[in-house]
């Protein structure tokens, strides 16, 4: 990493500050919509809230934001960047060589982050639309919760529907809108506190600890389940590191934290002033003058949409990284925007839409959704803490210090997990079931890949160079293709899958001028695009290792075109002049890609568990993108060949020949 790149990454700018507001803080910035409301409703309503309860609640929120968001994520996790990229899978790639079992927290953390992301749009948009209940002239319409649900679903349909076209055209307004949003949170919160400046006593952590053990707190430690709603966006903050740079987050987070803390304090001050008024509206909207509420609802809806968009885009990125790390099935990925960071995965988009819509229909109110929200993200944070401990050790932190620091955060997050566990019975089970389903799919995919590596046999290409040369020169066989390309997941030195050589020499000898053996390796660096070539001392056999970052598309033909030109220009590969062509001077022949698919056969030596893994993986493959589409081969000539998983060590089934018995009287 050059000093100039490091400086640019750590450097802050005015434009970067605004961009960070629009990309990074959508989730955590919309938490004031529902956090205080959740606390009040679980306490029994505004009239049941005492001053000590309010002071303790605000103190818990302030210190939760300080410990988890500021110290763990902003000050520690942001330093764990993988070539400027953040997030749990980027962190995993930094430490995966330290222990093979680290794949487990990475998969669990990724799955729970995905499942939590499916709930966020439902909670934020519903909370914003429910604000219309406090708007004079519209309240009589939106007192009917069905109208809230219909409006929310319309917004979600539009939001998920435009994903296929890319969101760059509206992304430019995200930053300015969120700047207005945070400014409003800060200003309105500050003015609400002017009549109750005692609310700032909540900065003292005494009030937080006192509330946890106070009889006035009807929920005891389980109140932390509502408190945690204030910091659910901390993980997203780390995941979006690569989009805005560390420096811009360092500069923007103090502003964001100040604004949301003022909002929480302002809502608390309004509750103290109106606890006997009988008003049972969301304190966030009720604390604003009635003539401004319609504008606030509009602004809150925009902020909720921006937060939802960030979660949707983050889900696409998360799944894309998991696919390239070979722990998730391959789904079709498109790039509707001008840059690689704007990607779209249709299957994931519509699964998220289905889950989000079902959440709105099943839970109906934001209060019911809040009762289920946050459980999964506590697990994600615990998994991130585990990986961070290994990262600190890798970077030279004394092991005892790394253990102590991360043990502290693990303890805090485990307490939040226990406090949120009660949400399981109030709808949290839906998020847990979704997370378990994602973990199951990841486990099957990862385990299936390991089984294939275990059983597939390899042969040395050098031992077959002469046979392949003879086949190339044998005019008794028709030319199969000028260039035949085999894609192999397993290629080390000159060792290659036996099934590939079987395809060339045995299955139907494939005569070609050049045989290409291509292996795609995903690197820990996100945007690597490099290759290494070995001609094996010939001009007809080419081994290509493609080294692509885990955020790069694996469109092999595009890379191969460049490699062919490089080899011909350097004289390592003869030009393939074409007699018949519409392109004058064309000196590259035609290509055919051969894909070999391994399938489980009933006569193979797999254990029952391994057979279950492979059969389940095969079933999942039916709904995933084909390798042809994944490697960008849909416009190329492709042959798909099916081979049994184990090409050797075939079990010999006992069978005897029936010998005719001669008639003794003959």
Swiss-Prot record:
Keywords: Cell membrane, Ion transport, Membrane, Potassium, Potassium transport, Symport, Transmembrane, Transmembrane helix, Transport
HAMAP family reported for this sequence: Kup (MF_01522)
Compartments, record wording: Cell membrane
Function, as annotated: Transport of potassium into the cell. Likely operates as a K(+):H(+) symporter.
Domain of life: Bacteria
Species this protein is from: Streptococcus pyogenes serotype M1
Lineage: Bacteria, Bacillati, Bacillota, Bacilli, Lactobacillales
Gene encoding the protein: kup
Membrane topology: Multi-pass membrane protein
Enzymatic reactions: K(+)(in) + H(+)(in) = K(+)(out) + H(+)(out)
Main location: membrane
Family label: Belongs to the HAK/KUP transporter (TC 2.A.72) family.
Protein name: Probable potassium transport system protein Kup
Transmembrane segments: 16-36, 58-78, 100-120, 141-161, 165-185, 221-241, 253-273, 294-314, 343-363, 373-393, 399-419, 424-444
């Amino acid at each position: 990493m050059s000093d100039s790149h490091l400086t640019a990454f750590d450097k802050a700018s005015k434009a970067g500050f605004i961009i960070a507001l629009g990309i990074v803080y959508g989730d955590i910035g919309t938490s004031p919509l529902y956090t205080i409301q959740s606390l009040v409703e679980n306490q029994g309503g505004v009239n049941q809230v005492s001053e000590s309860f309010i002071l303790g609640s605000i103190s818990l929120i302030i210190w939760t934001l300080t410990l988890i968001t500021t110290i763990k994520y902003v000050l520690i996790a942001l330093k764990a960047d993988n070539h400027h990229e953040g997030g749990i899978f980027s962190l995993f790639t930094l430490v995966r060589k330290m222990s093979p079992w680290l794949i487990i927290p990475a998969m669990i953390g990724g799955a729970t982050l995905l499942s939590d992301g499916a709930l966020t749009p439902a909670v934020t948009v519903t909370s914003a639309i429910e604000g219309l209940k406090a708007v004079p002239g519209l309240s009589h319409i939106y007192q009917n919760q069905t109208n809230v649900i219909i409006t929310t679903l319309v917004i979600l349909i539009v939001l998920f529907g435009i994903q296929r076209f890319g969101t760059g055209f509206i992304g430019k307004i995200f930053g300015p809108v969120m700047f207005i949003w945070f400014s409003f949170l800060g200003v309105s919160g500050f003015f609400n506190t002017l009549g109750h400046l005692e609310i700032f006593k909540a900065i003292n952590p005494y009030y937080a600890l006192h509330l946890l053990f106070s009889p006035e707190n009807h929920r005891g430690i389980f109140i932390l389940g509502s408190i945690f709603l204030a910091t659910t966006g901390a993980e997203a903050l780390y995941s979006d590191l690569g989009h805005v740079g560390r420096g811009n987050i360092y500069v923007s987070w103090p502003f964001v934290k100040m604004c949301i803390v003022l909002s929480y304090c302002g809502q608390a001050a309004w509750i103290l002033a109106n606890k006997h008024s009988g008003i049972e509206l969301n304190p966030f909207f009720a604390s604003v003058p009635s003539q401004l509420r319609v504008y606030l609802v509009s602004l809150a809806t925009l902020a909720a949409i921006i937060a939802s968009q960030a979660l949707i885009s983050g889900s696409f990125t998360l799944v894309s990284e998991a696919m390239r790390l070979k722990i998730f099935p391959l789904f079709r990925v498109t790039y509707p925007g001008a840059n690689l960071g704007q990607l779209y995965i249709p299957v994931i988009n519509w699964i998220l839409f289905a889950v989000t819509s079902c959440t709105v229909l099943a839970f109906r109110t934001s209060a019911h959704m809040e009762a289920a929200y946050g459980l999964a993200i506590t697990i994600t944070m615990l998994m991130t803490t585990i990986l961070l401990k290994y990262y600190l050790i890798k970077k030279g932190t004394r092991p005892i210090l790394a253990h102590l620091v991360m043990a502290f955060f693990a303890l805090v997050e485990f307490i939040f997990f226990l406090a949120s566990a009660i949400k399981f019975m109030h709808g949290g089970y839906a998020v847990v079931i979704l997370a378990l389903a994602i973990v199951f799919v990841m486990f099957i995919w990862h385990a299936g890949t390991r089984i294939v590596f275990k059983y597939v046999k390899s042969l040395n290409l050098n031992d077959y160079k002469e046979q392949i040369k003879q086949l190339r020169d044998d005019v008794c066989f028709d030319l199969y293709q000028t260039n035949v390309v085999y894609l192999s997941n397993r290629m080390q030195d000159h060792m290659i899958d036996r099934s590939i050589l079987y395809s060339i020499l045995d299955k139907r000898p494939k005569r070609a001028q050049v045989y290409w053996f291509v292996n795609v390796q995903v690197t820990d660096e996100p945007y690597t695009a490099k290759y290494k070539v070995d001609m094996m001392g010939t001009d007809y056999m080419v081994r290509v290792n493609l080294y692509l970052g885990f955020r790069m598309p694996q469109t092999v033909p595009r890379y191969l075109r460049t490699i062919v030109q490089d080899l011909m220009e350097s004289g390592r590969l003869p030009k393939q002049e074409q007699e018949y062509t519409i392109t004058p001077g064309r000196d590259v022949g035609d290509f055919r890609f051969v894909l070999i698919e391994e399938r489980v056969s009933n006569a193979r030596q797999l254990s029952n568990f391994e057979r279950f893994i492979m059969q389940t993986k095969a079933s999942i493959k039916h709904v995933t993108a084909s390798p042809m589409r994944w490697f960008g081969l849909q416009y190329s000539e492709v042959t798909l060949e099916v081979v049994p998983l184990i090409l050797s060590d075939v079990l010999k089934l006992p069978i005897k020949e029936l010998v005719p018995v001669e008639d003794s009287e003959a």
